[in-house]
């Protein structure tokens, strides 16, 4: 498949999944060049292909827009997943995500923020600037562990929080998920036990399944986070090798652990010689005065692999993440060379240019303000239209709300009913291998709020009321 066909396929999937809705203006050709790292001609051919297939339309002097009735992609066949001793989550996740790919569906189930929140024009200028000075050596210079200037810029941002991490300890990856997967591979072998939260980010469950690892799900409170007593019991009973947790703005619950609990967590895992793989992709999306510290701040024995990215706070399309890997840095580099080889060189260089100015912090302040406003508006709409029996668990970060239905309602059944009205929600079953969270669902508040979203919440309230 040629590059322009690959880009066209990627955009078709974004339209089908609801990232781009009918009538939405797509990124301009120049903006798409910045996002994809492809040439202007390649992007132009991709857009022309999508236009010829009826997915988008061109408007003179205006740009490209998603067609009012974008062609629906055929449903992919459900691939059966072999049951592992601990994890079998992929089939259900695939079913739910595939069902909500229709662009006419309101994407409350989405895990992504609204792409219109990101500074595409500024990033485009950065990409154009580095393109003028890039050399043939750039690819070699940006092989693992990644661009030296970018690693230094990330290390400086750690230093702003009083955390000293050498650029040599940082490995640039293709997004946070690669950082997390490589971290798991570095400290485990197939068949090892790994602790996760219950509920947890479904990407963690998928990673465990793929690497043939066994999961221990530890009770996690919607406000207080992981139960440290239950965690210690698990550590006493099982030969645990790693613990994959989110300490800031946890997905799906939204809590942030207190500094005291983070310190206790790190000390407890160190006592049992268990590596903490800290998933910190939402750390910049806080609404309080000070940025919360990661658990890595309490790491005195090189026992925390801290993973994050720019995907949720700056630009998903660049797929740039990292892991502060400490003593595991060289092993993670070798693992990366055997899998993805390296992370996109133009994207790394563009981020170096962008981060060299004060634009990033200005963008983050604006992004946090917009997300807080959108979350408040969505929360108020949910309070207006949902029955009083529904509990809405609010938090001071990120763009998710966690909703609890009264017994005996089932969020999985509700999600299927909602889809018939072109509304998607993320039921609790997506975030756990058990049935503990069958009455819960995650709600994305990051998308621009309008009449369509208002009516969708109103319809959701009617569906719940009918089931009481």
Report the location of each language-model feature.
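N-terminal basic, amphipathic alpha-helical segments
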Residues: 1-128, 309, 333, 337-344, ...
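Amphipathic, non-transmembrane alpha-helical secondary structure
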Residues: 8, 12, 181, 185, ...
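Conserved core segment of the aminotransferase class I/II
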Residues: 123, 300-369
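Conserved core of the PLP fold type I
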Residues: 137-272, 284-301, 371, 461
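Conserved glycine-rich beta-strand-loop-beta hairpin in the small C-terminal domain of fold type I
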Residues: 369-379, 390-404
């Amino acid at each position: 498949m040629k590059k322009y066909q690959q880009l066209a396929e990627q955009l078709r999937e974004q339209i089908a999944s609801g990232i781009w809705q009918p009538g939405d203006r797509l990124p301009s050709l120049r903006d798409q060049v910045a996002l994809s790292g492809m040439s202007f001609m390649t992007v132009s051919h991709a857009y022309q292909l999508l236009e010829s297939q009826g997915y988008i339309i061109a408007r003179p002097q205006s740009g490209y827009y998603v067609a009012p009735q974008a062609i629906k992609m055929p449903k992919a066949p459900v691939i059966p997943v072999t049951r592992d001793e601990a994890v079998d989550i992929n089939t259900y996740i695939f079913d739910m995500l595939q069902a909500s790919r229709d662009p006419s569906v309101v994407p409350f189930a989405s895990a992504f923020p609204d792409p219109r929140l990101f500074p595409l024009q500024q990033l485009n200028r950065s990409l154009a600037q580095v393109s003028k000075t890039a050399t043939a050596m750039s690819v070699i210079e940006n092989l693992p562990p990644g661009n030296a200037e970018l690693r230094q810029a990330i290390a400086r941002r750690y230093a702003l929080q009083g955390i000293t991490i050498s650029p040599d300890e940082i490995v640039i990856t293709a997004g946070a998920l690669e950082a997390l997967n490589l971290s798991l591979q570095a400290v485990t072998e197939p068949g090892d036990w790994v602790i996760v939260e219950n509920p947890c980010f479904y990407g963690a469950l998928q990673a465990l399944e793929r690497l043939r690892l066994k999961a221990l799900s530890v009770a996690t409170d919607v406000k207080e986070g992981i139960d440290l007593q239950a965690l210690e019991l698990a550590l006493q009973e099982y030969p645990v090798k790693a613990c994959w947790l989110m300490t800031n703005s946890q997905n799906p619950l939204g809590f942030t652990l207190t500094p005291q609990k983070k310190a206790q967590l790190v000390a407890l895992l160190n006592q049992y010689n268990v590596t903490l793989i800290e998933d910190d992709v939402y750390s910049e999306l806080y609404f309080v005065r000070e940025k919360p510290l990661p658990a890595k701040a309490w790491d005195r024995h090189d026992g925390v692999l801290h993973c994050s990215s720019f995907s949720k706070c700056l630009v998903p399309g660049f797929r740039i993440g990292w892991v502060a890997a400490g003593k595991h840095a060289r092993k993670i580099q070798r693992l990366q060379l055997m899998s993805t080889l390296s992370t996109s060189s133009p994207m790394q260089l563009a981020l170096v240019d962008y981060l060299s100015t004060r634009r990033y912090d200005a963008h983050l302040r604006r992004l946090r303000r917009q997300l807080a406003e959108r979350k408040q508006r969505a929360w108020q709409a949910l309070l207006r239209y949902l029955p009083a029996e529904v509990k809405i668990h609010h938090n001071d970060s990120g763009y998710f709300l966690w909703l609890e239905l009264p017994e005996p309602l089932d969020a999985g059944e509700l999600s299927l009913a909602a889809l018939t009205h072109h509304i998607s929600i993320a039921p609790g079953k997506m975030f756990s291998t058990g049935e503990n969270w069958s009455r819960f669902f995650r709600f994305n508040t990051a998308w621009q709020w309008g009449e369509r979203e208002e009516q969708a919440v109103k319809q959701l309230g009617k569906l719940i009321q009918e089931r009481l």
